[in-house]
């Protein structure tokens, strides 16, 4: 092989508990995604849950990252095998699964990414991920090079964090701070002490099971605190947030 698909460097870095600094991509544009890739982030989330992304918009973004060292991570809209299969076939190896609340849901996400007998992924002999049949060892290598990160963002997920983190095939735990805050009765206030304490608890339980933990933290002070608490993969901003802040600052400079 000469295409450097394997090994999955992001999966290797997570397993080694290496700090990985990332960014969120929500504008669904190959141009902005390419710019993010050139910035030097270790990983990028291409959001399919809250951003207007689907297969047709994600393929150009994967192409835009072809020459980048940033690992593309897709957040699927839901933990559904057919959706996950389509993302696998277009070339994603790293998955962020939203709203996982039980060990069974975590195991289902893992199974959706594995070919039988280890999982339930459907087989296509020619697709973008295996360079349309030109990667000879794709089937032998694929199962062990998929990264599964599950999001904990509800009270039930918090209650089951140990079982979720212990699930075979789960590579990392990701905290969804906004939804977690809402579930705890603090909508719009992820900085509430109770929410922060719960985030720290999730990190600790993930670490106890040898699993790296991550979070989205667009405020620098928050990101640095989470890193101090043991988070190893942190998204420190988003293309949408940076674009909005930058354009607002530019307008204010001349309009006020």
UniProtKB/Swiss-Prot annotation:
Q: What class of enzyme is it?
A: lyase
| Listed name of the protein | 5-keto-4-deoxy-D-glucarate aldolase
The subunit field of the Swiss-Prot or TrEMBL record says:
Homohexamer; trimer of dimers.
Locate the site labelled Transition state stabilizer: 75
Per its record, the protein catalyses:
5-dehydro-4-deoxy-D-glucarate = 2-hydroxy-3-oxopropanoate + pyruvate; 2-dehydro-3-deoxy-D-glucarate = 2-hydroxy-3-oxopropanoate + pyruvate
Q: What does this protein do?
A: Catalyzes the reversible retro-aldol cleavage of both 5-keto-4-deoxy-D-glucarate and 2-keto-3-deoxy-D-glucarate to pyruvate and tartronic semialdehyde.
Q: NCBIfam families this protein is in?
A: GarL (TIGR03239), PRK10558.1 (NF007849)
- Tell me, what is an example of a GO biological process annotation in this record? galactarate catabolic process
- Cofactor(s) recorded in Swiss-Prot or TrEMBL: Mg(2+)
Q: Which residues form the active site?
A: 50
This entry's Enzyme Commission designation comes to 4.1.2.20
The keyword Lyase belongs to this UniProt entry's keyword annotation: yes
Q: Which residues are marked as site: Increases basicity of active site His?
A: 89
UniProt binding sites for substrate:
151, 178-179
This entry's Gene Ontology molecular function terms read:
2-dehydro-3-deoxyglucarate aldolase activity; magnesium ion binding
Which residues hold Mg(2+)? 153, 179
Pfam families in alphabetical order: HpcH_HpaI (PF03328)
- SUPFAM superfamilies for the chain: Phosphoenolpyruvate/pyruvate domain
Q: Cofactor stoichiometry and binding?
A: Binds 1 Mg(2+) ion per subunit.
Name the protein family.
Belongs to the HpcH/HpaI aldolase family. KDGluc aldolase subfamily.
């Amino acid at each position: 092989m000469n295409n450097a698909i394997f090994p999955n460097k992001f999966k290797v870095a997570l397993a080694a508990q290496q700090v990985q600094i990332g960014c969120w991509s929500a504008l669904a544009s190959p141009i902005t995604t390419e710019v993010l890739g050139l910035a030097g982030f270790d990983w990028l989330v291409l959001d399919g849950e809250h951003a207007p992304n689907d297969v047709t918009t994600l393929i150009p973004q994967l192409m835009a990252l072809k020459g980048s060292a940033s690992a593309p991570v897709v957040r699927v809209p839901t933990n559904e095998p057919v959706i996950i299969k389509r993302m696998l076939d277009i070339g994603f190896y790293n998955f962020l699964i939203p709203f996982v609340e039980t060990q069974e849901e975590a195991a289902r996400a893992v199974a959706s990414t594995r070919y039988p007998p280890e999982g339930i992924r459907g087989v296509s002999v020619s697709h973008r991920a295996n360079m349309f049949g030109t990667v000879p060892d794709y089937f032998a290598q694929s199962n062990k090079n998929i990264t599964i990160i599950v999001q904990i963002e509800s009270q039930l997920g918090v209650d089951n964090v140990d079982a979720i983190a212990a699930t075979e095939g789960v590579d990392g735990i990701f905290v969804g701070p906004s939804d977690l805050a809402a579930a705890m009765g603090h909508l719009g206030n992820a900085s509430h002490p109770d929410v922060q304490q719960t985030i720290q608890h999730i990190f600790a339980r993930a670490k106890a099971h040898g699993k790296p933990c991550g979070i989205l933290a667009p405020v620098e002070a928050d990101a640095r605190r989470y890193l101090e608490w043991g988070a190893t993969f942190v998204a420190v901003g988003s293309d949408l947030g940076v674009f909005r802040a930058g354009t607002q600052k530019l307008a204010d400079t001349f309009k006020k």
